[in-house]
Amino acid sequence: SLFELGKMILQETGKNPAKSYGVYGCNCGVGGRGKPKDATDRCCYVHKCCYKKLTGCDPKKDRYSYSWKDKTIVCGENNSCLKELCECDKAVAICLRENLDTYNKKYRYNYLKPFCKKADPC
C-alpha cells in the first residue's frame, strides 16, 4: 500500500515521501506519465511499469509485510502478488536513494505535468 511505500522511501532516503516525491517530474506521484525528466523521475517511471505487471492485488491499497534488517528492506510475504508488490516498492526506494545526488527541486511541485512528453511504453 501507499503506507508501506512511503515508509520504505523515508527509510532509504531520509526524505518525506509525500513532500519530496508526491509531485515530482512527470512520473512521481498520482497520475502523471511521461518521458522522465531525470534519474529520480526515471525511478518512478520504472516503478509504475513494475505495478502494471502485478495481477491479483491493488498496489495502492493492499498491505504487505516487510522488515528492515541491517539497513536492508526484506520483503516477507507468502502471497506472490504481495511479495512482488513489496519488491516493486523496495526497488523504487533504493533507486531514489541511489539518485539523491541528482534530485532537482525545480521538478518538485511546480513542474507542469501537461508539458510531459509521452513516454515509451513499459
From Swiss-Prot:
GO CC term, one of those recorded: extracellular region
Region (Important for membrane-damaging activities in eukaryotes and bacteria): 105-118
S-S bridge residues: 26-116, 28-44, 43-95, 49-122, 50-88, 57-81, 75-86
Domain of life, per lineage: Eukaryota
Protein activity control: Myotoxic activity is inhibited by suramin and rosmarinic acid. Cytotoxic and myotoxic activities are inhibited by pre-incubation with varespladib. Suramin inhibits this myotoxin by (i) direct blockage of the MDoS and MDiS, preventing the toxin/membrane interaction and disruption and (ii) formation of an oligomeric complex, resulting in a tetrameric configuration for which both MDoS and MDiS becomes physically inaccessible, thus avoiding any possibility of toxin-membrane interaction or disruption.
Cited SUPFAM superfamilies: Phospholipase A2, PLA2 (SSF48619)
Tissue-specific expression: Expressed by the venom gland.
Keywords: Antibiotic, Antimicrobial, Disulfide bond, Fungicide, Myotoxin, Neurotoxin, Postsynaptic neurotoxin, Secreted, Toxin
One Pfam family linked to the record: Phospholip_A2_1
GO terms assigned for molecular function: calcium ion binding; calcium-dependent phospholipase A2 activity; phospholipid binding; toxin activity
Site feature: Hydrophobic membrane-disruption site (MDiS): 112, 115
Site (Important residue of the cationic membrane-docking site (MDoS)): 105, 108
Entries under InterPro entries matching the protein: PLipase_A2, PLipase_A2_Asp_AS, PLipase_A2_dom, PLipase_A2_dom_sf, PLipase_A2_His_AS
Annotated site, Cationic membrane-docking site (MDoS), chain positions: 15, 19, 113, 118
Biological processes per GO annotation: arachidonate secretion; defense response to bacterium; defense response to fungus; killing of cells of another organism; lipid catabolic process; negative regulation of T cell proliferation; phospholipid metabolic process
Cellular compartments annotated: Secreted
Additional information: Lacks hemorrhagic, anticoagulant and coagulant activities.
Family: Belongs to the phospholipase A2 family. Group II subfamily. K49 sub-subfamily.
Subunit description: Homodimer; non-covalently linked (probable alternative/compact dimer conformation).
Protein name (record): Basic phospholipase A2 homolog myotoxin II
Organism: Bothrops moojeni
Lineage: Eukaryota, Metazoa, Chordata, Craniata, Vertebrata
